[in-house]
Every structure is written in C-alpha cells, then in structure tokens.
C-alpha cells in the first residue's frame, strides 16, 4: 500500500486536481491518496472563526459568501457531466449551508474545529466526483472514521491502525482510496485537527 499526500496548492485549481488524478492512476499498486483543502480555503476558514470569535458576523458572512463563490466557479471548470456537476453542487451546498448555520450559533472552540474541517471534506468529495466522472474506481474513506489523536494531541497510532484496517477490509475490491489530511477526532470523539502540516 502506497500513501500519496497532495497539499492545497496541488489541488488548488481544477487542472491541478485533474493532474493529480492522472498521477494516482499510474502503476498497479494499491494507494491511499490524502488530500488537503483547496489552497486558500483553510486560511479563509480560520478567518471565519476569528471573525465569529470577535462577534463580527457580517465579516464572517462576507468571507463565507466569497469562498462559496470561488467553489461554485471551481466545480464548473472541474466537472463536465450534468450528473457529476449536480453532485458537486450538492456537496458545496451541504457544506456552505453548515457554515451559514453557524452564524446563528454561539461560537466556541469545538465549533471552530468543525469549521476548520470543512475544507478537506469538500476537496475530497469534489475529487471523488471527478474520479467518478472519469470512470476511475475508488473508495472515499472519511478520515473522521479512523484518524484519532490522544489526550496529548498526538496521533493515536494503535487506534488508527485498527480502525483503518477494519475499513479497508470492507473494500477488498478497491485499489485506490481517497481520504482527508489534517482532520481527525480527539480523545473525546470530537472533530479536531492535526494542526497545519500535521498530516504529513
């Protein structure tokens, strides 16, 4: 099993995401492909959290709207078939509906971690839609189902190994897997992250 990690710049434009698809489909070995959020997304999500922490909901809303507009343009360049474009639009609507809902919720650090997770969740779902459009067989593995940190915020490798192996055994017919970098669950089972660069 080979692990291939692609950062935000590698998937930051539709043509780069398409190049990643070509790279990961060469050779016969099984691969787990780990993707970051599209470049600029995590910075925008951090800014949303900072604005909400200061009580500046109009600024948070402005950043959300600008980011959503960017994603709407992105998928139109990435996805060409009506079916996968519809799927891509549904992904964007799901995650930006969440970001708009949080404007009405009391802000706290746990909510901030949920905000920060949205970038990787979107990038991998959109990439999966592109692979599907190209007829590339794969499985999308949610990192939140197996990536875990301990009480010291360090990767809990034993738990990760057991959970990931269990998931892979459910997909013995697949040789290509896509998952998220950066995001994980903490020792309380809450959405958390490995900090910037931590997924490397």
Model-derived regions, located:
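Nucleotide/pyrophosphate-binding catalytic subdomain
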Residues: 1-200
């Amino acid at each position: 099993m080979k692990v291939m990690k692609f950062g935000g710049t590698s998937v930051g434009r539709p043509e780069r995401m398409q190049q990643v698809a070509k790279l990961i489909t060469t050779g016969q070995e099984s691969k787990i492909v780990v993707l970051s959020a599209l470049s600029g997304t995590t910075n925008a999500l951090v800014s949303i959290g900072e604005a909400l922490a200061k009580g500046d909901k109009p600024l948070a809303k402005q950043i959300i709207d600008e980011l959503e507009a960017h994603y709407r343009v992105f998928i139109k360049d990435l996805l060409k078939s009506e079916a996968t474009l519809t799927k891509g639009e549904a992904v964007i609507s799901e995650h930006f509906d969440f970001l708009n809902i949080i404007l009405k919720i009391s802000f706290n650090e746990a909510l901030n971690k949920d905000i920060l997770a949205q970038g990787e969740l979107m990038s991998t779902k959109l990439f999966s839609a592109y692979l599907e459009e190209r007829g590339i067989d794969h499985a999308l593995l949610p990192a939140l189902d197996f990536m875990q940190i301990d009480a010291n915020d360090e990767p809990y490798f034993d738990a990760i190994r057991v959970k990931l192996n269990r998931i892979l055994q459910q997909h013995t017919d697949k040789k290509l897997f896509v998952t998220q970098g950066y995001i994980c669950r903490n020792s309380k089972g809450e959405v958390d992250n490995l900090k910037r660069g931590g997924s490397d």
